[in-house]
Amino acid sequence: MGRVTERRKVIRIRDGAVSTRPDTLVAEEPLEIRLNGKPLAITMRTPGDDFALAAGFLVSEGVLAEQRDLQNIVYCAGATVDGSNTYNVVDVKTAPGVRIPDITLERNVYTTSSCGLCGKASLDAVRTTARWPIADTPPVRVTPELLADLPDRLRASQRVFDRTGGLHAAALFTEDGELVDVREDVGRHNAVDKLVGRALQNADLPLSRSVLLVSGRASFELAQKAVMAGIPVLAAVSAPSSLAVDLAAETGLTLVGFLRGSSMNVYAGADRVALRAAVGQG
């Protein structure tokens, strides 16, 4: 628990000079997520906020949607031969009456730090019905100026990145640009799960007046996680994938990419971005 960084000795070469020095690395360890005692998924993550990560993952799977859906989450002892607790296995127990989607029951997958969708049988299988449809969320409007300010604020909040240079991050902002929460992880999808899981634990779902900002690209999976949490605006500092754009268009999600300086691309849901000039075709 809390094993966020590790120190390792490295050989540094700079301007032809060679030296040996310690370096701080981001920790990466497997986390097995069990659902009601049954193995469900393994993800490579940065230790910390494991319960929130597991809860957020299950929100994106359509298992959890409200705080009352969750009974408890515990670390599992006995995961090793000597029976010790490695803090790398968690068991999520749902509240009585919570229906587990068939797709979740059929899954037993390995997800990497960058792709949580590895192991999905098909694209159609992950188009789960959201409990909080984006189209039903209250009207949210953000300005390009507000969006342009968010990446620098996210970067300023990345404390572990400052020590390692090796972490992704995700942040929740209000529609007025107030920073609500920031999570870091070796995987973008884990960082988002930690945000969403914490919101579920605090009974803050749906996040219907929120803007989600992610470092790096916006994949289909990240768009799905935003939709399942009821987040109306997803912004990324890099490019979205074609499937992310398709999902955003289908669900009404506002998707912004290449958010750098005062420049950005709006790929879907432009009605939530307060544009002052008419959009031309070029």
Swiss-Prot record:
Query: One MF term in GO for this entry?
Result: sulfur carrier activity
Per UniProt, the keywords (alphabetical) are:
Cytoplasm, Molybdenum cofactor biosynthesis
Q: Residues in the active site?
A: C115
- From what superkingdom does this record's organism come? Bacteria
The record's NCBIfam families line, in alphabetical order, gives: fdhD_narQ, PRK00724.1-2
**PANTHER family according to UniProt:** FORMATE DEHYDROGENASE (PTHR30592), SULFUR CARRIER PROTEIN FDHD (PTHR30592:SF1)
The identity of this protein, by name, is Sulfur carrier protein FdhD
